[in-house]
Structure formats: C-alpha cells, structure tokens
C-alpha cells in the first residue's frame, strides 16, 4: 500500500510538472487584437518645432491583446510603451508587438499604447518636457484601464508597465516622481505652455495612475532623489553596461553633451532602490 501510494504521488507530481502554467507558459493558442482604442486626447506637437505653442489635439490610442477563450476575471494587465527617443516610433514596432502577443498567450491582457512624441535636441529643457508628456499619457492610459477594469476583466491592482528605452523613461518617472517634483520647465514660458499636473491630461478619470510593478529595459531617471523608500513599487531592470544611448550609470543621453540634461541609469536606480 505504501508503494502504491508513493507511485501515485510520483505520478501526480509528474503530471503537474508536465502541465503548462498560466502567466509563465503560453497556455493559449490564439489571441484577439482590438486596435486603435482611444484612451485620451491631448495637444500634440509637429515633427519639427522650435517652440511648443503650435499644437493640435490628437486622440491617444492603444491596441489591446487578449487570449481567446479566456474565462478568468480580474486578469493582470501589462502596458507596453515603445522606444524611439521621443521623436520616432509607435506601437507597431516589432518588439512591443511580439511582447504583447506572447504576454496575451500567457494569460495577461496587453495594452500596447501610443504616446505623444516631440523632442528638440538643441533645447536644454525639451527632453524634460518630452518625458513629462509621455508620463501624462501613460497616466491617462492607466486611469482609463482602471476606470473600465470590469469591461476589460482586469484586476485594477495588477497593472504593470513594461517600457523600452524612452518607454522606460516614461515608466520610471511615472512610478517614482510626484507632482511637486515636476521639472520647472514643465510649467512653461512665454513660448511654451504649462503642461499641467501629471494626471491633468488625456482624460478626466479620477483613478490612481501609479503602476503596481514596472519592467524597465535600458531606462533612466532625471533625479535619483525622486525615488523614496516608501514607493514600494517592484521594479525589474535590464541594461547593458556599455549602452551608448542611455547610460548604465549617469551621463548624457546619446553619450553626447549637447543640450539634454544628465540622467541616471539602471545601476544607480538599483542602488537607490
């Protein structure tokens, strides 16, 4: 009897080990993509600009990837934010599309967002304003998802950001900075408008805009003092030590002292956390 029970236990463990695990393995074969879902509206800059007064309001949209045949409520969500140095890129780039697909097949709901671009590398403050606009758009996306979490079958307490390069800048700044820490440049000058508070753009939903966790791929932050011990946001970072675009420690973006301010990369963020 003891041998029989032992065999049954071993067989049971073998069966369990052979089964795919949701959120780790691709347990769904098919996904459905809902394209161009509008999550907000905000003033956008032209591709070429010197000052920021010449804007046109645009819809902020995203593509939603979901597993077909999923009956689970309160699913975790991942917001993917693309790269592009704040002057190029969109949510059709291969990496964010592939990540959105494979995450949906693992049982997550993927929200692959577009955000406003606009960077003048000859301006000493354009980079700060570009990151801040991206923060506002990511905030609007999170607030939209939390507002409609029942329609999306999303757990509003399990909304994660996965950013790549510029997208990681957005995720890190949204996670760790507060309204009273916004750069002075975001308040505007005679030729550049006040961008408003972090949650004051895109839509009017009164939801919390902080992510519950963050994946940062070769990102950086503008001020290490923004990171507080009480933030308590789980963060996973990937970064090459010889990255020539975003410094692993501290330095200028693109490794060139032009007009953009110094930023602090993943190694120093890790030490601060």
Predicted regions located by residue number:
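Bacterial Sec-dependent N-terminal signal peptides
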Residues: 1-22
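N-terminal cap/lid segment of alpha/beta-hydrolase-fold proteins
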Residues: 19-73, 204
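Serine-hydrolase catalytic-loop signature spanning alpha/beta hydrolases and amidase-signature enzymes
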Residues: 85-90, 110, 144
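Primarily recognizes the serine-hydrolase "nucleophile elbow" in alpha/beta-hydrolase
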Residues: 136, 140-231
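Short beta-strand/loop motif that positions the catalytic acidic residue
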Residues: 237-239, 243
């Amino acid at each position: 009897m003891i041998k029989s029970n032992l065999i049954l236990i071993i067989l049971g463990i073998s069966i369990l080990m052979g089964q795919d695990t949701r959120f780790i393995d691709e347990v769904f074969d098919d996904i459905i993509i809902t394209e161009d879902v509008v999550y907000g509206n905000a003033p956008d800059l032209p591709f070429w600009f010197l000052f920021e007064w010449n804007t046109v309001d645009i819809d902020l949209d995203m593509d939603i990837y979901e597993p077909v045949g999923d009956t689970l409520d309160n699913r975790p969500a991942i917001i993917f934010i693309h790269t592009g140095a704040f002057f190029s890129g969109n949510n059709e780039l291969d990496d964010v599309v592939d990540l959105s697909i494979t995450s949906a097949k693992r049982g997550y709901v993927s929200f692959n967002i577009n955000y406003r671009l606009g960077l003048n590398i000859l301006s000493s403050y354009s980079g700060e304003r570009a990151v801040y606009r991206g923060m506002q758009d990511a905030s609007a996306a999170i607030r939209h998802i939390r507002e409609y979490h029942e329609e999306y079958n999303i757990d509003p307490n399990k909304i994660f950001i996965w950013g790549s390069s510029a997208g990681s800048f957005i995720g890190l700044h949204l996670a760790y900075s507060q309204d009273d820490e916004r750069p002075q440049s975001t308040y505007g000058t005679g030729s550049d408008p006040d961008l408003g508070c972090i949650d004051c753009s895109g839509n009017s939903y009164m939801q919390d805009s902080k992510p519950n966790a963050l994946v940062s791929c070769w990102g950086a932050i503008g001020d290490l003092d923004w990171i507080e011990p009480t933030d308590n946001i789980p963060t996973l970072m990937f970064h090459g030590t010889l990255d020539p675009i975003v410094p692993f420690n501290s330095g200028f973006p693109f490794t060139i002292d032009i007009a953009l301010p110094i930023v602090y990369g993943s190694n120093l963020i890790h030490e601060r956390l």
